[in-house]
Amino acid sequence: MIIDRNVWIVRPLPHGVNRMNEFLDEDIIAIGFPTGKSFENFSSDDLKKILASHGWDEGFKTANLFVKYLNKNDIVVVPDNNKRDIYFGIIDTKYFHKPDKDVPYENLYPHQRKVKWLFDKKPFLRSDLPDEIRGSLRYPGTIANITKHREFIENIINLENTNTTTETSLKSLAVTQLKDLLTSQNEEIRIRAIELVMKHNL
């Protein structure tokens, strides 16, 4: 599903190395694949060929999504590899290439986008998120589209403009947002919200 504003899981693990701290410090999300070239003007076929020439055939989907489908103003949900913390951000730029990170065998991350991290770069707890979102976070790939959860996630990130902080339990926030979803225009979301309210006696 690709619409006007998408929500993406982006894992901070280029070449299997946890770069969550670097992502936060440098205000970025990024992927690896140091080929010595920017992917900006590559067609999908060109991208597939250059990755294959370096033995990264399985990385095509990740690179293609990152370069061609993520967009400025999309929401990113970035789960730290500690399986506890979740960070929220807004993509702030188009794709760009960092030559100084394009070093073979260093497990770096040359293909980047700038991100505005929300909530002063403080994490939410994975355990406080609704079951449906936690289920999506179990997807093992580097990048996944979870726009089906956009309404709920936008309600969370809108807290950035209130006095609410991450010290407030997301469980209590989830109750408020869930009740708001009872009036959603989307019938499937509305029915699911009713089921959850009844299940948890909210």
For each feature predicted by the language model, list its residue ranges.
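Compositionally biased, charged N-terminal/linker segments
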Residues: 1-62
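Boundary/linker segments flanking structured domains
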Residues: 9, 158-163, 170, 190-192
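Short, cationic low-complexity segments
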Residues: 32-37, 137-146
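Structured alpha/beta reader/binder surfaces that contact nucleic acids or chromatin modification marks
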Residues: 37-110
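Alpha-helix boundary/N-cap detector
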Residues: 57-61, 144, 165-169, 173, ...
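Aromatic- and Lys/Arg-enriched surface recognition patch
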Residues: 83-84, 90-143
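Long, charge-rich alpha-helical interaction segments
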Residues: 140-165
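Amphipathic alpha-helical protein-protein interaction segments
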Residues: 172-202
